[in-house]
Amino acid sequence: MATFISVPLKKTSEVDLVKPLSKYIHNTYPSGEDQTEYCRAVDELNKLRKSAVGRPLDKHETSLETVMRYYDQLCSVEPKFPFTESQLCLTFTWKDAFDKGSIFGGSVKLALPSLGYEKTCVLFNIGALASQIASEQNLDNDEALKAASKFYQLASGAFSHIKDTVLSSLNRDPTVDISPDTVGTLSLIMLAQAQEVFFLKATRDKMKDAVIAKLANQAADYYGDAFKQCQYKDTLSKEVFPILAAKHCIMQAHAEYHQSVLAKQQKKFGEEIGRLQHASDLVKTVSSRYDEYVNVKDLADKINRALTAAKKDNDFIYHDRVPDLKDLDPVGKASLVKSTPVNVPLSQKYTDLFEKMVPLAVQQCLSVYNQRKSELINSTIAQMRDATIFANGVLASLNLPAAVEDVSGDSIPQSILNKSKTVIEQGGIQTIGQLIRDLPELLQRNKEILEESLKFLDEEEATDNDLKAKFKDRWQRTPSTELYKPLRSEGSNFRNVLDKAIGADAVVKERYQSHREAIVILCKPEAELNAAIPSANPAKTMQGSEVVTVLKSLLNKLDDMKKEREQLENDIKSVNFDMTTKFLTALAQDGAVNEEAISVTELDQIYGSYTYKVQENLKKQEDLLNNIQSAHQEFSKMKQSNSEANLREEVLKNLAVGHDNYIELVANLKEGTKFYNDLTDILLKFQCKCSDIVFARKTERDELLKDIQQSIAREPSAPSIPQVPSYQSAPSSISTNIATSSIPTPAPRTVFSAKQPPPRPPPPAMPSASPVPASAAQASNPAPTAAADSSQPPSNTIPSQAQGPPYPSYPGYPGYYGMPMPVGYNPYMYGQQTIPPYMYQPPSGQPPYPAQQPSFSYPQQPFFPPQ
């Protein structure tokens, strides 16, 4: 009777995890020990998948342990990699576990780029393998009974978990085997079998009949519920339904039997007989309907023996009234089983291969934090650099410090010499010219990469739209138009960035042209530089004046402030703080990370003091520039004013401004070159991302096309089978066939008119024909139609050949016997005529052949009637 239901495993196609995961690791994590370790872990994960789902598995706990370790690893990997169609696209293909396939195509399968789908299918295999291991247990000992119950409850929990999560994991209709209805039924079946195992253990341990009856009745209840859930569905194999119905009756019979024993102990002999009669009826039902699936002979014998003895005792001794079945109290229920919840890790030997890799949520928080940090640092540094540029502009407009250095009127001020030296050391006009010439080439390279990336998306999207229009509702996958929205948005952002870069390049070129003449002068040797600066009358002796001393002091303080800002910039850039621990702690405590609150607080603590120092420095510079402008006004009043001095001062101002713009332009051009080079790397990654998703979509498209072709092949070519021709179904006379058949009537054969031969002697009787009296033979052959009718096969056999017009026969000569033809042979497909050959006629008066001697047989051709 111990017939248990086990679930077949799902089968999958091979998937290369190494290439896409390693590629993501190389693009995301810097080279070093962590990157090498993560790539090694990817190799181990790929091997683990092959061991868990890529080969046939033994029905043993070690195989189950391997599958559970793979499931645990999937749960660990899921939050650490962006498994989405638009980022890290891995397509997993699984076949329906219950579909046997057809002659027109393979079994039903589903391919989805979803790690949740992979987890669901692996969990299904955990439940299936657990059910197989439980079914293989030898239930003759306690350890095997405990193991079977444990594995059945594990299988029930796995199927129940799939029922609750499959729709949210897939976001589309799953295959039938993992649909909520199917796995819900499987979970209930596994629970019923676990309860039955407890019933068997209680019976083996000879527990009280009241307890055993409750356990059996609860098992019957589980089996009944499972049968109700699946009796109108064609999802499980056909053997499952009768087994569930039989188990329901059997466990109910056990419950009634043990309850009858309890009634006997309580001296309720009528109730005992009533329950035994009900148990006997249940067993008879199983024997009559489900005998090929379960054997209940021993149970039936035990119940019948008890029933016979109870009736005998009651008839002779007790005379207790036997109550009707409806009047019996229902048997109690006691459930000792429950679905084992799916709590990761399932495996006791699990070790996380990616233990050091932080979850994707933390990675995203770190990315946002680093962006906030960069924005804060860049804005602070930009403030300091803008302050320096502003101060240099003010000094250049006042011709400082050259004005206080140029007292002779014909020598080059030291500050101008220093500026000229700086320009020459940085490459002069050649460097800035080369940087400007390189920009268009770098820009064009980035534009080509971006256009090529978007072209990948456009071509695949056009193909997807064409197939959607062709197959309509059959084309069930995420439309490329919707899937590529994030990538197209990213591409649009890149295009805007390039447009802004083009505008910035134009501004840089315009500034270069405005100050090119001053920069060219600064690049000249000292003698040529001195000649390019107009001379003026010597200024009044002002070296010892108080205003010059004040100006020089103020200028020195301004230089100190510039140096202070440079030091602050270096200090701010050198600050480094790892937020991983804080984000991981928040994730562990709250289950989520409030990145903004944590990041703002930490950034304020780390950079608050630097921000304060920068603001103090800027405030001091503002006051200092005001003092410099006031002192310069007094200095200007003291200087001798003439046209030559004014012209010289104007040239010196232009040279100072040219120097400042040269430094700024070189910095901008180098920054622009770095920007384009960095953007090239980013665009190459974007191109790679587009290429990867297009390749994954093409693979998914090929799988879907294959599935659609197989589904089309499995569909019937017509709504119903046409009516079978009459000559293939019921053997009847030609006249009846022609009159009743609904198919077109074939044209009759051509019968050649020939001279009637003289009567021939009767041939010997055919071996297959039964002996017939001469009178009967004459009566049966009055006309050709009669002869034809006599050659018809019995009505309950398939005709030996296709029917055709009857051939003439002669008195005393039975119609010819046709050679058996293959069933379905159609004589109308061939143009030959079958006419009986002319047989030798003896001269008149010659005696006929003796009856015991056979006549001469002519040679026969294949497929022609024998003579």
From Swiss-Prot:
Which keywords are on file for this protein? Cell junction, Cytoplasm, Cytoskeleton, Phosphoprotein, Protein transport, Secreted, Tight junction, Transport
| Polar residues composition bias: residue spans | 792-803
Give a yes or no for keyword Flavoprotein in this entry.
no
Task: Fill in the PTM field for this protein.
Answer: Phosphorylated on tyrosine residues.
Q: Where is the composition biased (Low complexity)?
A: 729-744, 767-791, 852-861
UniProt GO cellular component terms: bicellular tight junction; centrosome; cytosol; endosome; extracellular exosome; Flemming body; melanosome
Which superkingdom? Eukaryota
**Annotated ranges, domain BRO1:** 3-391
A Pfam family assignment: BRO1
Disordered, as annotated region: 714-809, 835-867
Q: What is its main location?
A: cytoplasm
Against CDD domains, the record matches this protein to:
BRO1_Alix, V_Alix
Q: Which intervals carry biased composition (Pro residues)? A: 756-766
Secreted: is it a keyword of this entry? yes
Please provide the Gene Ontology terms (biological process) for this protein.
mitotic cytokinesis; protein transport
Gene3D superfamilies in UniProt: alix/aip1 in complex with the ypdl late domain, alix/aip1 like domains
Q: What does this protein do?
A: Multifunctional protein that may be involved in endocytosis, multivesicular body biogenesis, membrane repair, cytokinesis, apoptosis and maintenance of tight junction integrity. Class E VPS protein involved in concentration and sorting of cargo proteins of the multivesicular body (MVB) for incorporation into intralumenal vesicles that are generated by invagination and scission from the limiting membrane of the endosome. Binds to the phospholipid lysobisphosphatidic acid (LBPA) which is abundant in MVBs internal membranes.
Q: What is this protein called?
A: Programmed cell death 6-interacting protein
Organismal lineage: Eukaryota, Metazoa, Chordata, Craniata, Vertebrata
